[in-house]
A protein has these predicted regions:
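Sec-dependent N-terminal signal peptides
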Residues: 3-17
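Short S/T/G/P-rich N-terminal loop/turn motif that feeds into the first structured element of a domain
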Residues: 19-233
Length: 233
């Protein structure tokens, strides 16, 4: 089943990625606040084992902190890696250790949704910023949007944050999202006012206005949420 799902995933991906870009899958679920510590313990116990995942795959556990009432999962596991690494991860087959982990996890959680996609343009180091704001887009002209996005952010993005433009491939919601922007921060102060660095910087302000004007008629923001990294293996 894992091999079949990954084959379908790859068949849906038509863009060639740069070496630093990555594929991802997410599994979102709900867990009561009183049981979060137990879930964290189970995840750490399992994913800390050397044979728990393929080489080159990183697993994250996130808390869905700020979200709308339809995007109402509480936590999420995310698997990321290169195409080869993720292909190996989803070709490993079932094993007793994995099944036992899922059984234990199911005692505390209720499944919500799952999705898959890939990054397109990443500025900064993925996986190093614990607070992540995510904007969900419906993009009509993907090539034009990506070009404008890269032009602005590659020049003006502050060095202490990570910016990724990516695309949803599988598990899209009825809202019809096609792309996302992930902004990684080290603290909430910066995350709360992500555009503060432009204040007083006339070049950045001008470039931002030009970027917005260029993409305004081809992009619709559908949703936003903030997730917090609480585990990484």
């Amino acid at each position: 089943m894992k091999k079949l799902l990954f084959t379908c995933f790859v068949a849906c991906c038509s863009l060639v990625l740069n070496a630093q870009e990555y594929y991802w899958t997410t599994y979102s679920f709900n867990v009561e606040a009183s049981q979060v510590e137990a879930v964290e313990h189970l995840a750490n116990e399992y994913f800390s084992k050397a044979d728990s995942k393929a080489e080159g795959v990183t697993v994250y556990l996130f808390e869905n902190h700020f979200r709308d009432n339809e995007n109402d999962w509480s936590h999420q596991f995310a698997f990321t890696g290169t195409l080869d690494a993720m292909g190996e991860q989803y070709s490993r087959g079932e094993n007793d250790s994995w099944e036992l982990f899922l059984t234990k996890l199911g005692q505390y959680t209720k499944s919500h949704s799952a999705a898959a996609g890939n990054s397109l343009i990443t500025i900064g180091e993925p996986g190093t910023h614990p607070i992540q704001n995510i904007l969900w887009f419906d993009v009509e002209d993907a090539s034009k949007f990506a070009s404008a996005w890269k032009k602005y952010h590659s020049k003006f993005n502050p060095k202490d944050r990570r910016m990724t433009l990516g695309q949803f491939r599988l598990g899209r919601s009825p809202m019809g999202e096609t792309h996302y922007a992930l902004m990684g921060f080290n603290d909430f102060k910066t995350a709360f006012n992500a555009g503060a660095y432009r204040k007083g910087n006339k070049a950045a302000e001008k470039a931002w206005s030009e970027f917005i004007e260029e993409v305004d008629d081809i992009v619709t923001i559908l949703r936003s949420n903030t997730r917090i990294m609480i585990g990484k293996w």
